[in-house]
């Protein structure tokens, strides 16, 4: 447990060496899952406290949707990043690193754990949310740079941003299809 906390602190400090260590460890996929679970829990608590307080009819379905969204986001974003890095921006290398990307993207959500502070300081909801989002993007770009041995941080940052754009488009298409189906 202490080992996981030390890794989380090093990720939060954006220590590039910890990403390489995590990529090599076999147990780090489960640890990445734990971080994503804690992130989902913090987001669900914030939504319950500040967005849906007083609307008990919506509480449970929304909390379930938040947990599902966080885990789908982790899984889909990891696969989009892996696809873009392996197929489109491969630099001639044909390495498929699905598991490594899943591990490190899970760990890159560590800054989101700072959202627990919002429970005590609700006036900083927007500032902390935006700050942790930028922090997570930075961690994901660094993880992408390390996994795929890119020389440029900007290239990996562009891939992460493109991955988010593609994920948003997938969600929009999915919502349109569901809306038209029902």
Q: What are these model-predicted stretches?
A:
Residues 1-99:
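Selected alpha-helical membrane-embedding segments in polytopic membrane proteins
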Residues 47-54, 118-119, 175-179:
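Juxtamembrane "helix-exit" motif on the non-cytosolic side of transmembrane helices
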Residues 168-182:
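Juxtamembrane boundary at the C-terminal end of a transmembrane helix
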Residues 82-170:
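Hydrophobic alpha-helical transmembrane segments and adjacent short intramembrane/lumenal linkers
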Residues 55-58, 127, 181-182:
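Membrane-helix interface and helix-disruption motif detector
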């Amino acid at each position: 447990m202490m080992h996981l906390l030390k890794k989380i602190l090093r990720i939060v400090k954006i220590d590039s060496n910890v990403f390489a260590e995590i990529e090599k460890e076999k147990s780090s996929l489960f640890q990445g899952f734990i971080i994503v679970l804690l992130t989902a829990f913090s987001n669900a608590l914030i939504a319950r406290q500040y967005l849906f307080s007083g609307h008990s009819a919506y509480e449970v379905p929304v909390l379930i949707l938040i947990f599902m969204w966080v885990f789908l986001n982790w899984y889909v974003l990891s696969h989009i990043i892996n696809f873009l890095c392996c197929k489109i921006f491969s630099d001639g290398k044909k390495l498929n690193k699905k598991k490594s990307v899943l591990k490190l993207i899970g760990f890159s959500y560590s800054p989101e754990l700072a959202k627990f502070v919002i429970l005590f300081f609700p006036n900083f909801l927007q500032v902390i949310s935006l700050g942790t989002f930028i922090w997570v993007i930075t961690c994901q770009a660094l993880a992408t740079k390390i996994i795929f041995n890119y020389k440029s941080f900007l290239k990996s940052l562009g891939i992460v941003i493109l991955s988010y754009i593609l994920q948003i488009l997938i969600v929009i298409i999915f919502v349109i299809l569901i809306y038209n189906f029902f």
